[in-house]
Regions:
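Conserved catalytic-core motifs of GNAT/GCN5-like acyltransferases
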Residues: 133-136, 148-166
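Conserved beta-strand-loop-alpha-helix junction that forms the acyl-donor binding cleft
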Residues: 103-104, 118, 133-144, 161-162
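Conserved GNAT acetyl-CoA-binding A-motif
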Residues: 125-135
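Conserved acetyl-CoA-binding loop-helix of GNAT-fold acetyltransferases
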Residues: 102, 108-122, 144-149
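A short beta-loop-alpha structural element at the N-terminal edge
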Residues: 3-21, 26-30
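Alpha-helical elements of Rossmann-like donor-binding domains used by nucleotide-donor carbohydrate transfer enzymes
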Residues: 15-18, 56, 114, 118
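Amphipathic alpha-helical recognition patches that constitute DNA-binding helices
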Residues: 15, 96-97, 101, 115, ...
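Acetyl-CoA-dependent GNAT
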Residues: 10, 26-98, 103-105, 157-158, ...
Length: 173
């Protein structure tokens, strides 16, 4: 499988909608406390992504780099998306928060680490990004393993949530 980052077009938003509404894909998100975030369904972990939000979402996530970035993780051999990668700047953490979501039927193939490596390459090609950070609950061992295999290292753990970071210095080694 050859993976690449693919900038999503408006036609790709239907895939993102299916991804976020799939209970098997979103099971890792089930029961989390997001402070009453609109569109989040704690019983399934799914997140609403209605069609009327697509253009606005694209304006925020695709036209405001380095504040926001999103790309589909694309299997070039099969000519189809297998998930998405993102980052956004968190001023409080003074870091870009990295994320990856792999469609459930493509999990267990090492795509998390490979997709994160592509995200790392993209992020650190920019001079204005210095730290990628992720907060992964301890009850998600596959995600922890994927981030660590991609080169993220532990920064701390509080209330069972692991803070992992990847710095520009890590990238330049």
């Amino acid at each position: 499988m050859t993976l690449a980052l693919h900038t999503p077009g408006l036609k790709d938003m239907a895939y993102r909608q299916r991804l976020l509404s799939d209970p098997e894909t979103m099971a890792y998100n089930r029961g989390r406390d997001f402070g009453g975030a609109p569109g989040y369904h704690p019983e399934t972990g799914c997140i609403d992504f209605p069609r009327e939000d697509w253009r606005y979402w694209r304006q925020v996530w695709l036209l405001n780099e380095p504040q926001f970035f999103s790309a589909l993780l694309y299997d070039e051999d099969a000519d189809c998306p297998v998930g998405e990668v993102t980052y956004y700047f968190d001023g409080e953490a003074d870091a870009h928060i990295a994320g990856i979501l792999i469609e459930h039927r493509h999990r267990g193939k090492g795509l998390c680490a490979e997709g994160l490596r592509l995200l790392i390459e993209h992020a650190f090609a920019r001079e204005d990004i210095h730290v990628l950070r992720a907060e992964i609950p301890g009850d998600n061992p596959p995600a922890l393993k994927g981030y660590r295999r991609a080169g993220f290292h532990d920064f701390g753990c509080r209330d069972g949530v692991h803070a992992l970071i990847f710095t520009r210095e890590d990238y330049e080694k």
